[in-house]
Every structure is written in C-alpha cells, then in structure tokens.
C-alpha cells in the first residue's frame, strides 16, 4: 500500500470545489454474525484510512438496524461519519432527531441522513403503507422539517402539517451546531428533486454516463451527488479482468433484476434499466446492476480513463460521490488513485 495516499486522504489543497467521498457499509444478509461484524469494522477503518468523509449504511426490511450498525462504525473509527439510510415509515422524525442528538452527545460525531422514500412496493405493503411515490416525497419534506427544527432549536417547536403534528416538542440533549446532520435524498425523479430543494438536501443520482448530462446538467440551485462503483487499475485489461471476476454474467441474477423491476416504482431503477448495453471500451458499466449484484453503475478501466469520467461528473456539478461496498482494502487504494488523478484533471477540486 502507498502510505502517501493514506496520510494525505487524496487532497488537493489549492482547490475551491469541495468533493466529498463516502464508502458503503457491507450488508448483513447472507453472512454470519461474526463475519458481518468483522466486515463492518474493517470496511469502516479502511474507508477512514483512505480519506472518505463517511460511509453509507443501508436500511430495508431484510437488514439489521442501520442505527445499531452506525454505532459499530463509530466505535471502530475516529472521525468517519455514518450516512444513515432513513425510511420515514420505520420511525417518527422525533426518534431520528433523538438518535442524531444522542450520537452527538455520546461520541461527538456528526451523522448524515440518507432519506429514502422506499422503492420496493412489497416492503411498503408489508408495513401497510400504500402512499404513492410522489406523496412519499411530500411526506419526507415534513419529516425532515421536523428533524431540522428540533435539532436547531433548543427551546422547542410546534409543527402542524398534512402528515405530522408536534406540539411544544423539545430536543434534549441539544446538538452542537457543528454536528448538525447533512441531508441526502435520492434525486432522480421530479418529486425527489423537488424534495431535495425543499429540504436543502444533496440530490443523489444513480447516474447515467456523464455525456448524457451535458445537455441537461444538474440544477445548480441544488447540491448534487452520484452513487457509483469503481474498479480501476494501471492496466486496462487487468481492471476488466477484476470486474468480470467480481461480477460475472449471471442468468439467474438477470432474472432477479427483471423481477425486482416489476416490484419497484423507483425512477432511477427504471432509468438505468432502460439504458441497455454498455458500449465496448466505455468505462460506464451496468452488468453488476443488470444482474442484480448491486444497485449502481460502475466505472471500469485504467486509472486515467476512470479519473477522466470522475472529473467529467465533477465538472457537471456532481460534488458528492457515494462509492459501492469495497470488497477489500486494496480497492479503496485504487479508488484513491482515481480521485487523486481526477483532482489533477480538475485543479479546482478538493476532496474533503
């Protein structure tokens, strides 16, 4: 390993565009408890070592609780920020605010919230939540308003909306202003983008190739990010060998993806599925998504080619990157090389 990248956290300090990088925590499904606990601790430590700001923690009906996983992350790192997926149907906004304030009080650690509307109808039906897609985002806006007001006002708040009502509700312990949570939301649909703007949140896309955005760049009034995986090596052929070894073409996985499409009303899921085959020699790669191995596109190729794609996203206005689950420490090293080279291509960029 190159200790230079570890120590420096891949920074270009002469820049004035801040780029934040988040890793993703392993999932708890189909793995033993012992292996999962070790995976979480390892990935959290590696992510911090290689300069990530934080780490996304998934939530859905099949996974262990994201807040408890976040505590494991905090206990195994010194400054890595959990990006906790929050599904409004799971808990009252007061409970989320209480968790954020409690982590601030106990660990002096900032929490980020990744607001999810719930894309799989079966999960929502099991919880008796028939709320339509766009209405879930309208509910989310009220949900986040309550969280932000509770954490930003020590004297208490009253709020009455269409979905929630609180009366003279006060948050203790108070949250120091520097630990106020960052808010992310999936922003591929019109409803998601409107919610991001209303909440002051980062709109995160499961992106199309950067060329697709050159005639329709992201809304400059909203902070924007992308969720991608990266497999890069010095040698192009080696990168693709690793990519197909990790994500082999799988007919069973392809059928699982097609089935998932039928039970999802996520706009991003539909958009990626409609993109079709990746062109030869194009670093933008959808096989892992199309074969139900992961939920984001990948950038694959040699360092320079992948760095150029990353720099194109940054030039378009995407300044937050949420990377896929790293299978080992080595992959975070290679991702670090990519962002270092992207910083050289975009000299106004700083990875923070």
Residue ranges and their predicted role:
Residues 1-79, 180-181:
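N-terminal beta1-alpha1-beta2 module of alpha/beta enzyme domains
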Residues 2-17, 127, 133-175, 210-312:
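An alpha-helical appendage that flanks or caps ligand/catalytic pockets
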Residues 11, 44-49, 70-79, 100-111, ...:
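Acidic (Asp/Glu)-rich catalytic clusters
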Residues 15-25, 55-57, 81-86, 111-115, ...:
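Hydrophobic faces of well-ordered beta-strands that scaffold small-molecule active sites
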Residues 19-38, 85-89, 93, 177-188, ...:
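Active-site mouth loops of central-metabolism enzymes
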Residues 32-46, 99, 186-195, 302-312:
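Short, acidic/polar
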Residues 39-58, 195-205, 312-319:
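Catalytic domains of carbohydrate-active enzymes, especially glycoside hydrolases
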Residues 66-87, 139, 143, 222, ...:
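Alpha-helix-loop-beta-strand connector modules within alpha/beta enzyme cores
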